[in-house]
Amino acid sequence: MQNLIAILTLALLATHFTTACQTPTSTSTSRLPSWTLTPTNTTQQFRGLGPVSNDIVWVSGTKGTVLRTNDAGSTWTDVSPHFSLSENASNFEFRDIEAWSANSAVILSIGEGNLSRIYQTRDGGETWKMTFVNQEAAAFYDCMAFEKEIPSHGIARSDPVNGRFRLIETWDSGSHWSILSMNGTLPAALPGEFGFAASGTCIEAAAGRWYIATGGVDPGRIFRSTNPRLGWHLSNSSITGAAAAGVFSVRFRDAKDGIAVGGDFEKPTANKDIASWSCDGGVEWHKAVSFPGGYRSDVAWVPGRKDTAVAVGTSGSDITFDGGRNWTGFGNGTFDAVECINRGVCWASGARGRVAKLVMGDE
Ligand SMILES: *[C@@H]1O[C@H](CO)[C@@H](O)[C@H](O)[C@H]1NC(C)=O
Ligand SMILES: *[C@@H]1O[C@H](CO)[C@@H](O)[C@H](O)[C@H]1NC(C)=O
Ligand SMILES: *[C@@H]1O[C@H](CO)[C@@H](O)[C@H](O)[C@H]1NC(C)=O
Ligand SMILES: *[C@@H]1O[C@H](CO)[C@@H](O)[C@H](O)[C@H]1NC(C)=O
Ligand SMILES: *[C@@H]1O[C@H](CO)[C@@H](O)[C@H](O)[C@H]1NC(C)=O
Ligand SMILES: *[C@@H]1O[C@H](CO)[C@@H](O)[C@H](O)[C@H]1NC(C)=O
Ligand SMILES: *[C@@H]1O[C@H](CO)[C@@H](O)[C@H](O)[C@H]1NC(C)=O
């Protein structure tokens, strides 16, 4: 009887596995999209990208710069925080932004010691309040993520402190943050392992699950958790890691299907083993069949188009129509971050003030 149950269970598991991992049938291999640049009138680099709707988008980046558009990129308004005379805006680089409306957003600045900070606005960027300032010498904050289902719940992620990735958590949309301090349950890092503050997506929240991407070790690794207070599991990503290489971005469209991208930012066109996909919630990661054209710092699923995702990096952009198995290049302009919102609209941002939009035609 027990054997029978075991066999039945195995059969069920096998069926479930096969169903979950069915190869997507790519329907829309046809037209490739193209980016349209918008006039930001600045040369700052924007690694922080926060689209809210088709019209409202925020970007954040170097020299303490934050811009917002309310008209789909036709015009951009400088809504940067004002720094006191003793604090030079040039020292601040906002590598990540999360925005909920034209009024409400939080930004993360990177750096050693107290340069790692989080600011919050409720009035469209007219005023910003510092709601977190790092006091740990070893910490260096890289990225943050908020849940779609519980938008007030977010986690910001730092490089390791005492051998474990440092995480801070907010339950009120970034007004207050506290360190998740249970040593035994935080993700343990290998020597030399860290995260990339390249696009704000080295931590991901999707369908009630959390993911953390790492590099500096080979291969780059991906941690996952259904409850960050209780513990983390980890997997090899199948993406090659090195001093400047590993997993830069991990994104899930639901509880099962995820894509990870990365590579070596010092070798922008090297593309061996720089992208992988998972269909079991990040337990196993499989190498892509054909890779994007080079190092990619960010990837975003396109909502409403089941197996479509867009990846960007300093050497260009790529699209997949089969959930990350095969990638096709479209455009070679430099970008750091990409986000897609409803109705096949994506935004990308990067160096030299580049912020661009693409609208995919009907499927
Ligand atoms: C662009 O920026 C320059 C220098 O900051 C400024 O003088 C000019 O008015 C801006 N142009 C637009 C269209 O915003
Ligand atoms: C701010 O820093 C920049 C770059 O380090 C420097 O060029 C500038 O003079 C500084 N400004 C002030 C007011 O200290
Ligand atoms: C950051 O550190 C500098 C140098 O130690 C100090 O002068 C400044 O007051 C600190 N700022 C904050 C917000 O902690
Ligand atoms: C976590 O570990 C560090 C170093 O091992 C130790 O100093 C610290 O007290 C620990 N914190 C907690 C909350 O256990
Ligand atoms: C992950 O990769 C490391 C380094 O190659 C290897 O030692 C380890 O066994 C791998 N873990 C799994 C679960 O495959
Ligand atoms: C895409 O990847 C699949 C494996 O999932 C492979 O069988 C297929 O031939 C590839 N398609 C193209 C167009 O390269
Ligand atoms: C990028 O694309 C443009 C337009 O297709 C082309 O003229 C240019 O040579 C390309 N640059 C590189 C570095 O491939």
Q: Predicted regions: what is each one?
A:
Residues 3-18:
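Cleavable N-terminal signal peptides of Sec/SRP-targeted secreted and luminal proteins
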Residues 21-363:
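Residue-level hotspots at or immediately adjacent to binding/recognition sites across diverse folds
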